[in-house]
Every structure is written in structure tokens, then in C-alpha cells.
Amino acid sequence: TLFSFHKVILNTVSVPEAGYWHQGVQMAQRSAATLSKGPRFQVSKGLMTVLVSTVVLFVLCSLIAPTSVSSGPLGSMIPFASILAIAGLGQMLVIQQAGIDLSVPSAISLAAVIVTKLPQGDNDKLLGAVLTALAVAVGVGLLNGSLIGFLKLNPIIATLGTNALLFGFIMFLTGGIPSSSSDLLLGIVGGTTFGVPNSAFIAAIILGIVVLALRKTVAGRRFESIGSSPAMASVSGLRVRIHHGMAYVWAQILYAIAGIMIAGIITVSNAFMGDAYLLPSVAVVVLGGTSLLGGRGLPTATVVAAVFLSQLDQFVLALGVNFAIRTLVQAAALAIGVAIYTVDWSRVRLALR
């Protein structure tokens, strides 16, 4: 019986391992009990918070800076929000494993440069350039994953070094000379369908794939369980290092897609195109409610947070402030997001009494 098997396991493993195994059995029993009650739709705290914040922001924009919510500015905001959403989803996969990826700027720039430099405006060569950009992204992800997942280097140091390496490669590849996008890429990514930017549809498809992969596949559920408790996952026999490393691979693929998209919106690519996405890619993950300590990712909330942060930037821009203030606003949004989800506000209220 299951009870007898449970006793045998407890008698043959060490005390810490037995504790982890016992916790795993209890979690499985609770999950089975929940499933037996039938499906339930649940909205996470992160998604609800960022949804309400986004609605409030749009209301404020319509009252204080109406031009920021007119068709023109919104049409300009949506493509870049879509790019940020995809980059944020990549960062989310890494943060789920209690890591962080600082190679975002050069990873995005490299993909943009590849899909503009290789075709040289030739539409027939675009597909090969896109496949090359994705293949390079996989290689960069394997490098980051090996350094962090297997060699146990600090994620900040490892990815910062990778970012510098990629920047040097971009400068070698381009010689500091910008390259132009092909008409086909501009038409696919920069065009519209039924009045909606194509980039929004691409971001929605990517979001759907990420949600299905994390929620509906065995590999995705294992990925999330490892992020929640690496020690318990290791005792359960899951390959923690491989999953940690693969998070960086999938993240790089998403960064590459973001880079390809930005090349399809901005006609000229250079080595600095991705610089604006380092802080925001982390901010949207935090604002969406994913813990910096790892655990369950919230992809839908991350995408909504990308819309929130992009519109916030548009709002500040409509007020006529300079770039430095816009950066401070992004940093403040990140700090507020961390405070909302990590501070024990019950203790704060008790301390203030």
C-alpha cells in the first residue's frame, strides 16, 4: 500500500530527505483534493494588482494628459510594449529559478543586427537571418546556462560578462555602422491587421505558448516546482541544474524574438538598441508579482505589467519631462513593485501603532 511504501522510504533515507519526501506527499495529496473539487478559475494577486493599476493609469492619463491615450500615441506605444512583454517573459523564466539575466541589452541588439546585417535588405535572405539569430541565441543561452547551472557562477557576474562579450561581437560584426531592415521584416512586424499592430498579435502568441508550456506540460510543471523548492525537487529526482540552465536558453530565444521585432519597427539597427530594456525587463516581472526569490511565474501579469510600464513612460513623456526623469520613474516603479510583494505590511502596521 501507499502507507507501507511511505514507511519504507522514511526508514531508508536521511532525516532531511525524509522530511522533503513527506512534504512532497502532503502537497500531492492536497493537489489531488483540490482537483477532485473540479476546476476553479483563480486570479493571482499579482495579476489583479497590475490590472487595477493599469486601469487607474489609463484613467489618470485621460484626465491629466489626454493626448497620451489618443490613437497616435497608443499606436506608437503598443509595439514597444509588445517587445518589452516578450523580453519580460524571458526574464521571468530566469527569475523563476531565482536567477537574473543582465545580458538582455546585447542579446536584443545582437538579434536585431543579425536580421538586418545578413540580408542587407534582401527579402529572400530574411528567413535565413532569422534562423541564424535564433541559433545564436540558443548558443548564448547554453553559455549562460552552463556558467550558472553547472559551474555555479553568480548569475549577475556571469550574465554581465556575457553582455560585454556580446557587445564586443556586435561591434566586430557591424564595425559601428548601422544596418537597415528589409521591407519584408518591416511589413510583417511593423504592419497592422484590422488596425491593430502585428507586434501585439506576435506578443499574444508568445504569451499563449509560454502559458501552455508552463501550465499544461509536465516539463513546465517540473520547471515551476524546481523554482519553488530546488531542494525538494532534487530529492524527488528532478534535474535541477539542467532546468536552471535551460531557463537561460529559453530566455535568450525570447530576447532574440524581441530583437527581431524591434528591427522590424525601427528601420535602422545598431549595437545600443537593447539598452533600454534591461531595467524594464526586470521591472515588469516584479510588477507582475513573480518573486525575485524564485517560484511560480505569472506570464499574463508580466505582459500586463509591460503595458502598464510602457503607458507610464508615454504618460511621463506627454508631461514633457526629460529622459533622466523617465528612468527615475521606471526605477521607482520597480521599487514599489518589490515593496508591494515582499514587505510584510501587517508588521509595518503594527510598528506604526
Regions found by a protein language model. Give the residues of each.
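Inter-helical junctions in multi-pass inner-membrane proteins, predominant
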Residues: 64-76, 171, 213-215, 220, ...
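Structural signal for alpha-helical transmembrane segments and their membrane-water exit/capping regions
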Residues: 53-70, 97, 170-178, 211-218, ...
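Single transmembrane alpha-helix segments in multi-pass membrane proteins
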Residues: 56-122, 146-152, 283-299, 332
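Cytosolic-side transmembrane-helix boundaries in multi-pass membrane proteins
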Residues: 5-59, 208, 234-242, 316-353
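Transmembrane helix-bundle core of multi-pass membrane transporters
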Residues: 151, 155-216, 243-246, 265-274, ...
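Helix-loop-helix "hairpin" substructures at the membrane interface of multi-pass membrane proteins
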Residues: 125-133, 139-144, 195-269
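Alpha-helical transmembrane segments within multi-pass membrane transporters and channels
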Residues: 123-163, 305-308
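Transmembrane alpha-helical segments in multi-pass inner-membrane proteins
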Residues: 255, 265-331
